[in-house]
Amino acid sequence: MKEKFLNLLKKPITNSYLSNISKKTIKKEFFYNLSVVFDKKNYLVSLANPISPKKQYTSKYAHRASQSITMNQSFKKIALKLQKKFKPSFSLEIGSNDGVFIKNFSKKKIIAVEPCSNLARITNKLGYVTYDKFWNKEL
């Protein structure tokens, strides 16, 4: 049983910036109902109406997490704690963005999955194996 607990109404999709703002383009812009549900059976929080990955994760995804000093510091701190506590021989990061987290790991000990090809190219150029795919059971 899923219970809606937060309704943020209709929102434009992330990173879908309009290059030419007019009444016509605004009418064509994709909006979706952004509401959050709690699954009482599994104790999971998720979007009530997930957006198609193909629509959301494009080759022009603009947000780059490493441009934030706070994100860099936070991910470095988390990576160091995880490495100290678990001493992983290998790691997988799903949704690596531009490599803000994985850059704190040895290139031989981590693989990334990033559905936005422009971001996956960045981490590949840094020398990390990054799959330019959406994480699903086929991958």
PLM-predicted stretches and their roles:
Residues 116-118:
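Conserved SAM/SAH-binding beta-strand->alpha-helix loop
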Residues 126-139:
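Conserved SAM-binding strand-loop segment of SAM-dependent methyltransferases
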